[in-house]
């Protein structure tokens, strides 16, 4: 396979369920290794914490009590030196609704 037909692809996975993100990353790495492609990753990126603090009581009366809600966004990064054939196979992987994928050609 010539160098012109191979491209470096950066895959970013992110989602609210870390087990789903890890499962999709593992499937991508396993598929790439089975196809004989050079893989780097999955590289865990920092988890982003989104916090929202809301007042429990709708009125201003009573004690000042608050609820804290948190959402964590887990991210993984995978670099693959892939051909068009490998990219087509990557598109067939089943991805849960909680995981989002970004592909970037480098």
UniProtKB/Swiss-Prot annotation:
Keywords: Ribonucleoprotein, Ribosomal protein. Part of the 30S ribosomal subunit. It holds the Pfam family Ribosomal_S10. One of its GO terms (biological process) is translation. InterPro entries: Ribosomal_uS10, Ribosomal_uS10_CS, Ribosomal_uS10_dom, Ribosomal_uS10_dom_sf, Ribosomal_uS10_euk/arc. Belongs to the universal ribosomal protein uS10 family. It comes from Pyrobaculum neutrophilum (strain DSM 2338 / JCM 9278 / NBRC 100436 / V24Sta) (Thermoproteus neutrophilus). Involved in the binding of tRNA to the ribosomes. PANTHER family: 30S RIBOSOMAL PROTEIN S10 FAMILY MEMBER (PTHR11700). SMART domains: Ribosomal_S10 (SM01403). Gene3D superfamilies: Ribosomal protein S10 domain (3.30.70.600). The lineage of its organism: Archaea, Thermoproteota, Thermoprotei, Thermoproteales, Thermoproteaceae. This is Small ribosomal subunit protein uS10. GO terms for molecular function: structural constituent of ribosome; tRNA binding. It comes from the Archaea. One of its GO terms (cellular component) is small ribosomal subunit. NCBIfam families: uS10_euk_arch. Disulfide bonds: none annotated.
């Amino acid at each position: 396979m010539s160098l012109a037909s191979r491209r470096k692809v950066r895959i970013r996975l992110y989602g609210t369920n870390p087990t789903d993100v890890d499962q999709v990353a593992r499937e991508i790495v396993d598929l790439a290794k089975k196809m004989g492609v050079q893989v780097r990753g999955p590289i865990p990126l920092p988890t982003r914490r989104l916090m929202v603090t809301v007042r429990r009581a709708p009125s201003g009366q009573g004690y000042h009590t608050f609820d804290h809600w948190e959402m964590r966004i887990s991210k993984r990064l995978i670099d693959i030196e892939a051909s068009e054939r490998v990219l087509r196979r990557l598109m067939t992987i089943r991805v849960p609704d909680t995981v989002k994928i970004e592909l970037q050609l480098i």
